[in-house]
């Protein structure tokens, strides 16, 4: 009898190939049900930096439930005759994704319906990505954003629960779009002799991996992972990031470097959601790529070797590329939260970068999702342990500041703000009645700096008001701590600062420091 059972089991496996193959997790491209619940919980708790990233998302035009779709287009392209569709279709795909996220965060059906409207419109309409030069980037980058939106809606807004929800017809139509319009473009790049910089192959691979999940197509998924490890292309991991962390494109502008390495992180996060660890590949090679980017773009010296790329076309890049240096994209949270908060490793230079860019805003066009402080943050609320409404800023920590007019980099081995006009801003909550003293620790302000470098501002009756503080009148504690009293100043129109807990903008404007760095 026992032998008969074994014989029957063997025959069952033969009759149903893949019957015991690992099933895909849904929703499960970038976001599992568990991760979507975590995102909502962080927003409900107003936990920072996630809530700050959410506030940025909620204000984006593409995130509105009444967003006016620019398409759909029968043909989408990044260049050539139909290149005019690039911007509009990118905004539409981002809108589908943002509204899908906001549906899960807020529970508002208007966001779900907007996402469904865009997904359905393109699934019914788009029929081609023409074979122009940039076709792989169009299918890879834009396809990745759209499939993430579709995955969320397919498994969280079904017609069995909502009148306008996802139906079997939607499944057929959307799957057909991805298979017939997007997938052939991806496949063509894999089948063609290598001819591009590495970010192309990585963008294509992350989209194919994601389509594999959405389409429940194990071969698509496995082929993408095989390319990740073994692809004879600049876009495979060993061919793109060296053991030192230097990338194949490190001699180009730094935005392409950030695109390439962050696409690996996107790909690794999709695989992680499915139970596969690409993050750990080649001794955490993606982490090393991030640390190299962070360290070099902060102004530290890094090793650089002339790269012999797979195509032979780009081996002339003999020095580190300084174009775009220090302009950090919103791509750092995803890797930091995995390696540091999931795995307990250290990323000291990426940590510094996050001090500059948190909360992360949206991605650049469809290159990445951005918003990582909302989507991937796994740490404690940064407000925990702080007295609500108190302003005590330590510039040596440099958390959550936004500065478009200052570059943060190492000067003679010391981290400094350098620019012809150093200006930083951040959003704060201030309770002037409970905490009349505003404390700022600023270790190295040049003598040539603007004396009235601290300002608080908010609107009264829709009119902007600002309170300006003179550092010469501040109480000094030691050489680097300034204590300003809110009761000593009035706004330019004579108002006292509100005694209620107030959302305000805090600005540090050091002005033209004659080339001297603001050492922090």
Label every PLM stretch briefly:
Residues 139-142, 201, 257:
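An alpha-helical repeat/solenoid feature that recognizes helix-turn-helix modules
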Residues 386-407:
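Extracellular carbohydrate-recognition regions
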């Amino acid at each position: 009898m026992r032998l008969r059972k074994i014989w029957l089991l063997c025959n069952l496996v033969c009759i149903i190939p893949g019957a015991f193959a690992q099933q895909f997790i849904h929703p499960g491209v970038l976001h599992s049900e568990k991760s979507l619940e975590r995102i909502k919980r962080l927003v409900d708790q107003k936990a920072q930096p996630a809530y700050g990233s959410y506030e940025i998302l909620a204000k984006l035009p593409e995130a509105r439930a009444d967003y006016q779709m620019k398409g759909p287009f029968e043909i989408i392209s990044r260049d050539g005759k139909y290149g005019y569709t690039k911007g509009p279709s990118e905004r539409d795909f981002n809108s589908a994704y943002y509204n899908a996220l906001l549906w899960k965060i807020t529970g508002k059906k208007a966001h779900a319906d907007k996402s469904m409207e865009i997904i359905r419109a393109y699934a019914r309409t788009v029929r081609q990505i023409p074979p122009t030069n940039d076709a792989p980037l169009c299918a890879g980058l834009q396809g990745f954003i759209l499939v993430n939106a579709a995955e969320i809606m397919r498994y969280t807004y079904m017609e069995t629960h909502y009148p306008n929800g996802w139906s079997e017809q939607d499944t057929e139509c959307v799957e057909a779009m991805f298979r017939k319009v997007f997938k052939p473009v991806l496949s063509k790049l894999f089948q063609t002799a290598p001819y591009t910089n590495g970010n192309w192959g990585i963008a294509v691979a992350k989209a194919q991996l994601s389509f594999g999940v959405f389409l429940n197509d194990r071969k698509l998924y496995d082929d993408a992972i095989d390319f990740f490890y073994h692809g004879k292309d600049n876009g495979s991991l060993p061919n793109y990031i060296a053991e030192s962390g230097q990338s194949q494109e490190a001699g180009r502008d730094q935005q392409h470097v950030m695109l390439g390495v962050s696409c690996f992180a996107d790909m690794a996060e999709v695989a992680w959601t499915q139970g596969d660890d690409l993050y750990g590949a080649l001794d955490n090679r993606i982490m090393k790529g991030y640390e190299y980017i962070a360290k070099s773009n902060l102004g530290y010296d890094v090793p650089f070797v002339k790269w012999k790329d797979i195509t032979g076309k780009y081996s002339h890049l003999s020095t580190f590329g300084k174009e775009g240096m220090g302009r950090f994209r919103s791509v750092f949270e995803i890797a930091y939260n995995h390696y540091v908060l999931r795995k307990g490793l250290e990323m000291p230079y990426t940590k510094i970068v996050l001090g500059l860019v948190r909360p992360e805003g949206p991605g650049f066009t469809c290159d990445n999702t951005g918003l990582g402080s909302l989507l991937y943050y796994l740490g404690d609320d940064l407000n925990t342990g702080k007295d609500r409404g108190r302003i005590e800023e330590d510039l040596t920590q440099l958390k959550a500041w936004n500065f478009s007019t200052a570059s943060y980099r190492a000067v003679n081995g010391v981290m400094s703000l350098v620019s012809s006009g150093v200006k930083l801003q951040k959003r704060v909550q201030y309770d002037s009645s409970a905490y009349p003293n505003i404390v700022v620790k600023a270790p190295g302000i040049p003598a040539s700096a603007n004396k009235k470098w601290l300002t608080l501002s908010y609107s009264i009756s829709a009119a902007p008001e600002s309170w300006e503080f003179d550092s010469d009148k501040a109480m000094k504690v030691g050489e680097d701590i300034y204590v300003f009293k809110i009761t000593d100043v009035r706004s330019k129109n004579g108002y006292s600062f509100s005694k209620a807990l107030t959302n305000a903008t805090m600005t540090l404007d050091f002005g033209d420091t004659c080339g001297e760095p603001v050492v922090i």
